[in-house]
């Protein structure tokens, strides 16, 4: 469930932020903000579904997933292919997220 919550949250957050980007930077209608706000609310809800004891750890691990998802958005939606440095950076971030999520915790 955690992986699906993180992936869904990342897509919802990026879509919500992109709606504001489209309105403010691409001269789209202010009505783009309406689904953007709904998407950002969905993002916040989905993060509550992550199986973790502490919100801060959930958010920290989510950061790596967000970075990887943002690069997929860059490619799939904006048509700009990530370069090797983007991919290396995303791999490092996902590694960090895995350490945060799966690292042994003292009692």
From Swiss-Prot:
Q: For this UniProt entry, what's an example GO CC term?
A: plasma membrane
Q: Which UniProt keywords apply?
A: Cell inner membrane, Cell membrane, Membrane, Transmembrane, Transmembrane helix
Signal peptide as annotated in the record: none
Q: Which domain of life is it from?
A: Bacteria
* Transmembrane feature ranges: 4-24, 30-50, 60-80, 87-107
Annotated source species: Sphingopyxis alaskensis (strain DSM 13593 / LMG 18877 / RB2256) (Sphingomonas alaskensis)
Q: Name one Pfam family in it.
A: UPF0060
Q: Quote the InterPro entries the UniProt record gives.
A: UPF0060
Under which name does UniProt file this protein?
UPF0060 membrane protein Sala_0701
The record's subcellular locations are: Cell inner membrane
Major subcellular site: membrane
Q: Which family does it belong to?
A: Belongs to the UPF0060 family.
């Amino acid at each position: 469930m955690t992986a699906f919550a993180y992936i869904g949250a990342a897509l919802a957050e990026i879509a919500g932020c992109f709606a504001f980007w489209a309105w403010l930077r691409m001269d789209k209608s202010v009505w783009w903000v309406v689904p953007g706000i709904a998407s950002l609310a969905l993002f916040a809800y989905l993060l509550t579904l992550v199986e973790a004891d502490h919100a801060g750890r959930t958010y920290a691990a989510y950061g790596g997933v967000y970075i990887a998802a943002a690069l997929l958005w860059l490619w799939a939606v904006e048509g700009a292919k990530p370069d090797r440095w983007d991919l290396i950076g995303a791999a490092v971030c996902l590694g960090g997220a895995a350490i945060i999520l799966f690292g042994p915790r003292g009692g």
